[in-house]
A protein has these predicted regions:
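Sec-dependent signal peptide recognition
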Residues: 2-10, 21
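C-terminal motif of bacterial Sec signal peptides marking the signal peptidase cleavage site
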Residues: 15-16
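Start-of-domain marker
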Residues: 23-74
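Conserved polar/disulfide-associated segments of primarily extracytoplasmic proteins
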Residues: 65-179
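Core RNA-modification/binding signature centered on pseudouridine synthases
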Residues: 174-176, 186, 218-219
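Short, surface-exposed beta-strand/loop micro-motifs that present aromatic residues
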Residues: 180-191
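Surface-exposed amphipathic alpha-helical segments
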Residues: 193-229
């Protein structure tokens, strides 16, 4: 299983991006209006205030820069209200503030124990260039931080819940001719004894962006676990 775990890490890194709270915050919720499937497992996609799950739309599914990995099973894509209102022109829309929920086809049907999940977290360390947030915040604010496209900078790894491992990255993204810095979270979730992933992307706009990203990212994870307990 250790070799499989290493492979999990590699694929997770490639397909993800290009305040900690107690696990007691997750409460089981009944009913589900939006089901997705990963093999024989039913995944309930939670409702998130201010966002719309939109992966069922053909124009969303066809956007190549979001879903170009053959080894991914996309379970859902949550758009901000602004992006959802522009869905008719989705292929050309500059996205911000969105979640992608996915799994890996190669490991469909494989059960992951708590111990293996912890090992997965250990193997994930050191896979990115690491810098402290305090060491880069001034450069981010004044636009002088040096980040190459395809080489994100890891600024934090933490566990908002015992079944979620979160890595926070700074990434450079291009929209047309415009370059921008975004905060991306990569999340590995042990859900129904399987591995599910979600990534959150938010353009960096102020010193409070990181705090807001972590809060919204963690909230999404609690809702996802709560709907699938």
């Amino acid at each position: 299983m250790k070799n499989a775990i290493k492979l999990f890490i590699l694929i997770f890194i490639v397909t993800g991006c290009g305040e900690s709270k107690s696990s007691s915050l997750v409460a089981q919720e009944a009913d589900c209006e939006n089901l997705s499937h990963y093999g024989e497992i039913e995944i309930c996609l939670p409702e998130i205030d201010g966002m719309k799950e939109a992966y069922s739309y053909p124009q969303v599914r066809e956007r190549s820069d979001l879903f170009s990995y053959d080894n991914n099973t996309i379970l859902g894509l949550y758009l901000s209200k602004e992006n959802y209102l522009a869905i008719d022109n989705f292929e050309n829309e500059a996205l911000d503030d969105y979640f992608k929920v996915y799994a890996l086809k190669q490991f469909e049907g494989i059960e992951i124990s708590k111990l293996e999940f912890e090992e997965l977290g250990e193997y994930s360390k050191g896979n990115f260039i690491e810098k402290s947030w305090e060491g880069v915040i001034d450069k981010v604010l004044n636009g002088t931080i040096d980040i190459s496209i395809g080489q994100p900078v890891q600024i934090e790894t933490y566990k908002p819940h015992e079944d979620i491992i979160t890595t926070v990255l700074l990434i450079k993204m291009i929209s047309g001719v415009e370059e921008r810095i975004a905060v991306c979270t990569l999340n590995m979730v042990r859900l129904k004894n399987s591995l599910i992933y979600y990534a959150y992307y938010k353009n960096y706009t102020s010193a409070k962006t990181l705090e807001k990203v972590k809060a919204k990212n963690d909230y999404f994870g609690y809702k996802l676990l709560g709907k699938n307990n």
